[in-house]
Amino acid sequence: MSHLNLATLDTSQHPYLPASSQTLFAAKAKRKFTFEDISKQIGRNEVATAAIFYGQAKASAEDIANLAKVLDIPLKLLEEQLSGFPDRGRSVEMPPKEPLIYRLYEIVQNYGYAYKAVLNEKFGDGIMSAISFSTKVEKETDADGNNWAVITLRGKWLPFSRF
């Protein structure tokens, strides 16, 4: 399960993350697991798994038990650290400075109104949910050997109510 590319955490760069982030990332690094490795073992999507590590998603009791087992973290500690509700949206300053996260921000800056226009034409007046939502990341390699990142966003369409 050991991989060359391993996401780790420099807590000095992320002052707003919860204590659970440090616990989870330290155990992840010690075992040299990727988010894909962990997600397969706990039965979650790898982006959802990473979101738990960054304090941006709620871990179920089953998630907590599975993470404790897979990462060899005391269950009681994880239960204490992951029992609350996430304080979403505080982990990234705006605009973001980290280049990859900034590129995602830039995509919304450049194409946000285009997405909105096309979505409104297809679905009517409303929004795409980020709560009834799923996402995944895939890697594609073209015929020339170039690697492409494919990010799929899937959100329930919520029409605005007339009142």
UniProtKB/Swiss-Prot annotation:
Pfam families: Cyanate_lyase. It comes from the Eukaryota. GO terms for biological process: cyanate metabolic process. Gene3D superfamilies: Cyanate lyase, C-terminal domain, lambda repressor-like DNA-binding domains. It is an enzyme of class 4 (lyase). The keyword Transport does not apply. The active site is at R103, E106, S129. It catalyses: cyanate + hydrogencarbonate + 3 H(+) = NH4(+) + 2 CO2. Keywords: Lyase. GO terms for molecular function: cyanate hydratase activity; DNA binding. Its EC number is 4.2.1.104. Coiled coil: none annotated. Catalyzes the reaction of cyanate with bicarbonate to produce ammonia and carbon dioxide. Belongs to the cyanase family. This is Cyanate hydratase. It comes from Talaromyces stipitatus (strain ATCC 10500 / CBS 375.48 / QM 6759 / NRRL 1006). The lineage of its organism: Eukaryota, Fungi, Dikarya, Ascomycota, Pezizomycotina. The gene is cyn1.
